[in-house]
UniProtKB/Swiss-Prot annotation:
Active site, per annotation: 337, 361
Natural source organism: Escherichia coli O9:H4 (strain HS)
The name this protein goes by in its record: L-fucose isomerase
Assembly and binders: Homohexamer.
CDD domains: L-fucose_isomerase (cd03556)
Amino acid sequence: MKKISLPKIGIRPVIDGRRMGVRESLEEQTMNMAKATAALLTEKLRHACGAAVECVISDTCIAGMAEAAACEEKFSSQNVGLTITVTPCWCYGSETIDMDPTRPKAIWGFNGTERPGAVYLAAALAAHSQKGIPAFSIYGHDVQDADDTSIPADVEEKLLRFARAGLAVASMKGKSYLSLGGVSMGIAGSIVDHNFFESWLGMKVQAVDMTELRRRIDQQIYDEAELEMALAWADKNFRYGEDENNKQYQRNAEQSRAVLRESLLMAMCIRDMMQGNSKLADIGRVEESLGYNAIAAGFQGQRHWTDQYPNGDTAEAILNSSFDWNGVREPFVVATENDSLNGVAMLMGHQLTGTAQVFADVRTYWSPEAIERVTGHKLDGLAEHGIIHLINSGSAALDGSCKQRDSEGNPTMKPHWEISQQEADACLAATEWCPAIHEYFRGGGYSSRFLTEGGVPFTMTRVNIIKGLGPVLQIAEGWSVELPKDVHDILNKRTNSTWPTTWFAPRLTGKGPFTDVYSVMANWGANHGVLTIGHVGADFITLASMLRIPVCMHNVEETKVYRPSAWAAHGMDIEGQDYRACQNYGPLYKR
C-alpha cells in the first residue's frame, strides 16, 4: 500500500506586475525572499515523524490572477498544506492572495523604505479579512535595506511558529482517531465527539470494540517473532517494583509471565490497528494489515476489559514512549481511558514538538501549609507557592522521567530523532514496573513507576468541550519540581506509590486562574492533562487559532501571542477577540 505523502509548505513570492522597469527590478529580490524563507524552514523544522520539511516555491513571481492560478495548480499537485506569501513591494492585494479556505496562510511583508512591502501586507490582509479567510501577518520590527537578505530574529520567530502550527494542522487532516472501546467510567472525554474531530480537526473517528483486540490476541493476528523479541527486551530492561497486593491477589511467576506477555501483545496489536503492519499480510491477514490510518488512539480499558484482562498501562506507556524493542522511534499517541480530548492535546503537543507526551491525572493541589503539616518540609524555589501532583497508572511516556539530556546537560525530553539508545536505556533504568493494584485492576497488569526530575520546563494542556460553545483549550506553563526523597515518599504513598509522578509548579501571573497554584487546579476543566516539554504555550495558541479553538486559560506572555490579523477586529481585549473570532469564523472544516 502506498505511503501517504507528508504535507509541504508552499512559498508564494508576489510582485508588482507593472512591466517596463518595475517588475524587472524586483524579480530577483522577491524570489530571493522566497528562497531564504524556504531555506530557513527546511533547516530549522522537521515533521513530527522526524522527516525533513519540504518547501515548494511558485515557479514564477505572482503578479495577478493567472500566475496565482498557476501557483495553486502546482501546490495542489504537491500536497502543500500551508502557505507563506512573501514580498518586498507593493502588489495587487486580492488578486494575488491564497484563497484556499482551510489552508493556514501567512504573509511576510518586507519592512523596507524603497518599496512598500508593508502597504501590500496591509492591503492583502484587508482582503483576507473581508473575504473571511484569516491570515497571519509577518512584519519586521526594524527597517531593513533593500539589499539586506537576512531574516530578522522577530520575523524568524513568527515564520517558525506559523510553520510549526500549520504543519500540525495539515498533518492531522485526513487522519483518524482510533477509539478502542467506549466510555470509561463515565469520563466525559471518552464520550467521543465525531463532529469535533470532523469539523475542527479534519479527522475521522474509527470506533472499534475492545473485542477486536481480544480477537487479534486469541487468534494470533500478530508477528510472533516480534513478540519473542519484545519479551526478550522486557526481560533485559524491566525492573520490577514491589507487589503491594494482599497475598491472595499476588500472582506466581507463571501467572506474572502470562500478564507480561499479554501486556506486550496489547502494545503490538494496538500499534498494528493504528498504522497497519505488512507482516500480517504475510500470514494471510491482509485486511488487518492495513490498520485504521490512526494518528492517535485511546483505549477504554476500565472497567469492561480490566476487570478480566491485564490493564493497558504497560501497552500505553510503551507506545507513548520514544523507544521499544525495535529501538528509538517516533512515539505514538494513545490516551488512557479513551479520553479522546486529552488525546487531542497529546496529538497537538507531539505534532508541535516531535516529542513524547506525558498523560496524567491532575490529581492533587498541595499547598505549602499542607505539605509542611504532613511532612515538616517547607517548600521553596519553584515550589514555594505550592505544587500539583500529576499522577496516573496509565499511559505516561517513560521519556517523562527526563533522563535524556540537552546540549548543556540539563534533564529534558528530546524529539525522538535526537535521542540516543543510551538515553532510552536510562529512561528504562529509571522506571520500575509494579504489579497492578487488584482493587483497581482485577485482571492484573503492570504500572510504570518513575519520578520526573525537577527544574524541567513543561507546558500542561487540555481540550474540553462546552455545550453551546464547542471546544476550548487550556494551557499552563510551569516546571517540574524535585522534592526531598522522604517528602516525596510521604506524599506519594498517600495516593498510590506504584504509579509515575510529576510534581508540577505552574508559573503564576497574579491574575485570574493564575493568581495562585490553587486557582490553576480549581480552573482546570477535567481530571486529565498533558505535559509537553518546554514552554511552548505560544505554539499551542497559534495552532488553536488556526483550528478556531478559543483558549480559555493560559499564562503565556502577551507579546508571544500570535493569531491571525483579523482577530484584532473582534474587540480590544485579546482573549475576548479569540472567542469572538472563533465563533465568527466557525470550525476550520465547517460541517
